[in-house]
């Protein structure tokens, strides 16, 4: 039996009614008489969608809203005072203080077997360092967001494994991982001239876990000028962190582009787009490419770029089996960064549940001068949008992993790396001379290639758009990888326009031996 959104008084009254009904009636009440579910949140989301949008208001004193980042960093949550700290559950909660642009509180509630109660702001849970402020001004401030703590790396140490902070952003890590890319609840009109709308999680409900629980359940209410939504997250920590997401979205008004299961990452430079300035780090990115597993079984890999101009790429898919932003290549020598450890940043893989129908996986690449800006976005854009006020239900599993080999077709092969340089031709005197072309070197490896003889009849299928001429298409065995290396040299006709290319390895019967390499050479490069 489910009673939604009941107060403690209502709950006690209903229990009292059941008791008065006698022992016969009680015999039928074996399960708890109250439970919280996504339907409770969806009811709130539907009601919100029927009302005019009300923008959140800030209650933050100026000494916090105007502070610099260095000052905000001084505000430290005291983990010894974590929520559920005295309970035997392995999960604990800590909270983000408001400050800078995190200037609007979110409501956070605890759900138990019998009640829902707000988790109230407590200033004594924070160490403010050398900051000076009026303590009375923070009395009813509220939290900006929260973290989930769990002993993921050591049994006696609580590590931060998930964070919900800002708009509808959240990040998760598994064992041995460090924070990298983010996920979001919903994206609206991303990269459109009209401007992007950022929905916001305005309220959370977190189920108090039992001592033996290995998962944490979080509910969230999303709100924005043109959409509302109810979300249920089930977080399972481990070597890979797995999060099951269930959502019900309502539109207040029509949108031009609806982004489901959005991911946000950063790409500054890498082997397929080397840094224009000398840098001891060969690569600097949270993710190296977009991977798609289409409904027809095709696997596609798209290396990321940091373009000079905004770039939007669309990949038409029906009933996608998966897509995500991956960090392929875990060797420390690729990054050489002891501080930020890009080699330990997870990939995020979206595994849709059920059929999502027709639509596109969209990749947005935004120019950025440094690594402080998230400039990569990927999401699913359904071909058919829900009617205003009607629910859109969807669900997916989100994997946060460093084991990218598990995200391939185990019988095929995939791109190990893409390298770009100026093209050249070896002269009779053995000196290489540049010829005005751009060279792309693509290494393929995997089970489909590993056991083939070096002289096996492996060939390529290569295509480009009309803005490029292919002047070299050569394939050779790579004994280091026990795979094959494809070298392409192209001459760009109009440098002000990008070039789209695709390539795959096939056998003598033209049967695919690899995923499809889909590459865009950005404009003005």
Curated annotation (Swiss-Prot):
Pathway it acts in?
Answer: Glycan metabolism; osmoregulated periplasmic glucan (OPG) biosynthesis
Gene Ontology CC annotations of this record? outer membrane-bounded periplasmic space
Task: Supply the SUPFAM superfamilies for this chain.
Answer: E set domains, Galactose mutarotase-like
Q: Where is the signal peptide?
A: 1-35
Q: What is its main location?
A: periplasm
Compartment(s) where it occurs, according to its Swiss-Prot or TrEMBL record:
Periplasm
The UniProt GO MF terms for this protein read: carbohydrate binding; catalytic activity
Which GO terms are recorded in the biological process aspect for this UniProt protein? Answer: beta-glucan biosynthetic process
InterPro entries in the record, alphabetically?
Gal_mutarotase_sf_dom, GH-type_carb-bd, Glucan_biosyn_MdoG/MdoD, Glucan_biosyn_MdoG_C, Ig-like_fold, Ig_E-set, MdoG_OpgG
The alphabetical list of record keywords is:
Periplasm, Signal
Functional summary from the UniProt entry: Involved in the biosynthesis of osmoregulated periplasmic glucans (OPGs).
Family from the record: Belongs to the OpgD/OpgG family.
Give the protein name, as stated in the record: Glucans biosynthesis protein G
């Amino acid at each position: 039996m489910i009673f939604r959104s009941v107060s403690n008084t209502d709950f006690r009254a209903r229990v009292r009614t059941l008791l008065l009904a006698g022992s016969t009636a009680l015999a039928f009440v074996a399960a708890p008489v109250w439970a919280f579910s996504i339907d409770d949140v969806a009811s709130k989301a539907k009601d919100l969608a029927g009302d005019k949008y009300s923008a959140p208001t800030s209650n933050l004193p100026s000494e916090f809203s105007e502070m610099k980042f260095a000052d905000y960093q001084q505000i430290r949550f005291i983990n010894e005072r974590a929520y559920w700290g005295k309970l035997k559950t392995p999960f604990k909660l800590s909270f983000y203080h408001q400050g800078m642009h995190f200037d609007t509180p979110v409501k956070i509630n605890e759900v138990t077997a019998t009640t829902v109660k707000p988790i109230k702001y407590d200033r004594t849970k924070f160490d403010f360092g050398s900051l000076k402020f009026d303590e009375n001004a923070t009395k009813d401030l509220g939290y900006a967001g929260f973290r989930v703590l769990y002993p993921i790396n050591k049994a006696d140490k609580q590590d931060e494994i998930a964070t919900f902070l800002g708009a509808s952003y959240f990040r998760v890590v598994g064992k041995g991982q460090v924070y990298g890319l983010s996920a979001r609840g919903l994206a609206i009109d991303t990269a459109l001239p009209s401007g992007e709308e950022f929905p916001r999680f305005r309220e959370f409900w977190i189920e108090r876990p039992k001592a033996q629980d290995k998962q944490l359940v979080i509910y969230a209410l999303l709100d924005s000028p043109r959409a509302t939504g109810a979300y249920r997250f089930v977080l399972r920590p481990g070597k890979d962190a797995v999060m099951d997401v269930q959502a019900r979205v309502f539109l207040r008004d029509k949108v031009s582009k609806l982004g489901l299961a959005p991911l946000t990452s950063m790409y500054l430079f890498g082997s397929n787009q080397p840094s224009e300035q000398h840098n001891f780090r060969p690569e600097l990115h949270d993710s190296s490419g977009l991977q798609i597993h289409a409904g027809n079984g095709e696997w596609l890999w798209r290396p990321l770029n940091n373009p000079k101009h905004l770039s939007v790429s669309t990949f038409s898919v029906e009933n996608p089996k998966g897509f995500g932003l991956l960090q392929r290549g875990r060797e420390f020598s690729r990054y050489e960064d002891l501080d930020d450890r890009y080699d330990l940043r997870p990939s995020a893989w979206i595994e849709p549940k059920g059929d999502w129908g027709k639509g596109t996986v969209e990749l947005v690449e935004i120019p950025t001068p440094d690594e402080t800006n998230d400039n990569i976005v990927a999401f699913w854009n359904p071909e058919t949008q829900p009617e205003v006020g009607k629910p859109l239900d969807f669900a997916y599993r989100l994997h946060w992993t460093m084991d990218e080999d598990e995200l391939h077709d185990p019988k095929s092969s995939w791109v190990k790396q893409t390298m770009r340089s100026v093209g050249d031709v070896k002269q009779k005197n053995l000196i290489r001379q540049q010829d005005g072309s751009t060279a792309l070197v693509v290494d393929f490896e995997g089970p489909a290639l590993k056991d083939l003889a070096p002289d096996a009849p492996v060939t390529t299928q290569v295509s480009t758009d009309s803005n490029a001429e292919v002047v070299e298409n050569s394939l050779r065995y790579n004994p280091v990888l026990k795979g094959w290396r494809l070298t392409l040299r192209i001459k760009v006709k109009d440098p002000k326009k990008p070039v789209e290319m695709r390539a795959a390895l096939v056998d003598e019967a033209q049967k695919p031996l690899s995923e499809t390499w889909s590459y865009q050479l950005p404009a003005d490069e």
